[in-house]
Amino acid sequence: FYLGEIAYRKGDYPTAIKYYDAVLEQFPGSPKAPTAQLRKGQAELDSNQREAGIRDLRNLIQRYPDSPEATQGRSKLNGMGVRITPAKPSAYKE
């Protein structure tokens, strides 16, 4: 996760996405997973991968709807004028 954060801050979005994907695949229940999903979507948007970014932010909202990161994802999508479908309740607990 932290290697993804370092790559993201350096503007190395492809590397950041790779590290965030690893967190999501290997540790989907980790407390860092919602942040990894959010950052992955942001990195995709920042690297002009609009559709992938939108998809990942929607996945964030669906997988972790009660997380603070989902609130940020909703805000980002709303700001982009992207419609958000209602999410099902999740098992995410703060």
Feature locations, PLM:
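Acidic, polar-rich low-complexity tracts and alpha-helical solenoid repeat scaffolds
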Residues: 1-94
